[in-house]
Amino acid sequence: MSQRDTLVHLFAGGCGGTVGAILTCPLEVVKTRLQSSSVTLYISEVQLNTMAGASVNRVVSPGPLHCLKAILEKEGPRSLFRGLGPNLVGVAPSRAIYFAAYSNCKEKLNGVFDPDSTQVHMASAAMAGFTAITATNPIWLIKTRLQLDARTRGEKQMGAFECVRKVYQTDGLRGFYRGMSASYAGISETVIHFVIYESIKQKLLECKTASMMETDEESVKEASDFVRMMLAAATSKTCATTIAYPHEVVRTRLREEGTKYRSFFQTLSLIVQEEGYGSLYRGLTTHLVRQIPNTAIMMATYELVVYLLNG
């Protein structure tokens, strides 16, 4: 791959990530709040009568709409874009690094394995995920802390630089890498996503090629091609996210301020013990509602920018 091709993939990946992040930021804030242990801020208690006549309070987890309403009422609409700054700072380099690493790995591995085989896509996605996570984890930690900073209207909101200073004073440099083990576990989601995406993309390409051969038409990129890419991205991301979602909850807990959570497996075990298995999927609906259009927008933007820059 030439230096120009690498720069094209870097730029296209950055554009795709940025557009997706801006359009889906409110859903990202709601999802992060639902994943957090501080979700009790928005939890109501339901009083139940027992057989003996006594009453007990049962904690009921809030739904996405309940959480959204509570944020709007207590903190105002601007809080739905909390963490957007670090998100934009992080998403462009993260996606750029990811897509450039993915494309480079895929090109090199095509010479080792069968070209564009499942092994190539899996290994490329894993290496790209590892590279992007290691490089950008501090930015995502700050973004998560800002999104969890629930302050009512009128109170001064914590800024990104204040958050950076606070993390460094409390935990030192190591504090910026909290939750990275859960992010590494999440590479499985990336691998599943890209394997399914590339498989669907290949099938769509084969169908189009066969159709072109029958009609003797030249293969030209059309608007319908980008719609198909968006559908392929949405389908693959839905499957991957549903399978690997618990790592998202664990990662959010590890990134919380003053947390009792210390490591990936300790956090996973503690969440199950204290809140049950269902809590590992808290916020999944919101995550899917956000992630599906976000991924579709990101992948379609990426493919479009690569196509335009390559002529």
UniProtKB/Swiss-Prot annotation:
Taxonomy, superkingdom: Eukaryota
Gene Ontology molecular function, alphabetical: pyrimidine nucleotide transmembrane transporter activity
TM helices/strands, residue ranges: 7-27, 41-57, 111-131, 180-200, 226-246, 291-311
Keywords: Membrane, Mitochondrion, Mitochondrion inner membrane, Repeat, Transmembrane, Transmembrane helix, Transport
Membrane-protein topology: Multi-pass membrane protein
GO CC entries: mitochondrial inner membrane; mitochondrion
Function summary: Mitochondrial transporter that imports/exports pyrimidine nucleotides into and from mitochondria. Selectively transports cytosine, guanosine, inosine and uridine (deoxy)nucleoside mono-, di-, and triphosphates by antiport mechanism. Catalyzes uniport at much lower rate. May import (deoxy)nucleoside triphosphates in exchange for intramitochondrial (deoxy)nucleoside mono- and diphosphates, thus providing precursors necessary for de novo synthesis of mitochondrial DNA and RNA while exporting products of their catabolism.
Protein name (database record): Solute carrier family 25 member 36
